[in-house]
A protein has these predicted regions:
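Extended alpha-helical surfaces
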Residues: 1-170
Length: 170
């Protein structure tokens, strides 16, 4: 679980690299925004640099081939190309990371799983509720889009709670 939690920072670094590509930033500009990650990484600094130097978001995603992040981002590339917004790519990263974390928690032994579910489950519930609100209020997404951009599981927050927010209920 701890290694998977550490990947949260790797996901943030990938997001920073993609934003750097989109903004036309140099590698030196992006490098100073990255979390230092001396271990537990799948995407090395060298690979991050290749992403930024690729010159395009599509090229940056292709640099991630062979990692767990490539398929997540590749799946969202069509929507990125249609909208010219990093939003679908960033949501794909967030959802993929949290689904993986949920799976890792559920693979633990009974006692460890129960303890991890209480702490990590609560964080995932909060993320899900905040995402649903943010997607409705600030991004004006449809109910279906909000459901697609939130986690289908939770600890104490039920899917119906997220659906209620997506519909605009109190």
């Amino acid at each position: 679980v701890l290694t998977t939690l550490w990947h949260h920072y790797e996901v943030d670094n990938i997001r920073v690299a993609l934003r750097g590509v989109e903004a036309g930033a140099t590698w030196d500009q992006v490098l100073h925004l990255l979390y230092p990650m001396p271990r537990y990484v799948e995407v090395t600094l060298e690979r991050m640099e290749k992403m930024v130097r690729s010159g395009s978001v599509t090229g940056a995603v292709s640099v991630l081939r062979g990692t767990q992040y490539h398929s997540l981002l590749n799946h969202a590339l069509t929507r990125y190309e249609e909208e010219r917004s990093l939003f679908p790519l960033e949501v794909a990263l967030d959802l993929g990371y949290r689904r993986n974390l949920w799976d890792v928690v559920h693979s633990l032994g009974k006692q460890d799983r129960e303890m991890a579910l209480k702490t990590i489950g609560m964080v995932l519930d909060i993320d899900n509720l905040l995402w649903a609100l943010r997607f409705r209020v600030y991004h004006h997404l449809s109910e279906v889009e909000i459901i697609n951009y939130t986690l289908p599981m939770g600890y104490e927050v039920a899917d119906d709670d997220v659906r209620l927010i997506a519909r605009g209920g109190d």
